[in-house]
Amino acid sequence: MSWNDVKSYLKQRKDILLPFGAVEEHGYHLPLSTDGDIASALAQSLSEKTGVAIAPIIWYGVSNTTRRYPGTIMVRFDSFKEYVKDILFSLKQSRFTTIYLLSGHLSSSHIVAIQEASRDIKEIKAFFLDFSKLDFLDILETKPFHACEAETSLMLYLNPQKVDMTKANDEKIIFEDYAVSGLRKTQSGVFGS
């Protein structure tokens, strides 16, 4: 959209989708862009069904548990929260009043930063769309987590050219063993099958 397209859109509607991703490892078989690719596709689908505009994706986020893997780009919690606040404030200044926040990256600190930032900007309504709450567990054979069956399946559907299933592995993780941090518990970066 050009700024003039945004001006025309705002005469009709005041809502916008703001997708978030993260640049982080997703095992040997998925790209660093997995979270953003999923968020972008979900935002596009929602836009097509509802007519809501989509803001450009925020590619970087808080990725504490995957920071040791080359290619992961991590933003500190406070820096990310302030950055999100600035973006939300800019959207408010443009006269958007309702912002739908959609993140393909679901680490708790990343989500908390987005939610806290949205509470700090007055005069906007911000809604966090948590796609992890969708009822899809009955079609999965394994518990969804990170670079797992769920994310791999979504990427195979959305961007099969970005998935290298010849590199996929089935590294077994005992979930209770890494309640504090997953940094030392997986070689491949896959948390879940």
Task: Describe each model-derived feature in a short phrase.
Residues 1-193:
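Extended, histidine- and acidic-residue-enriched regions that form the cofactor-binding/catalytic faces
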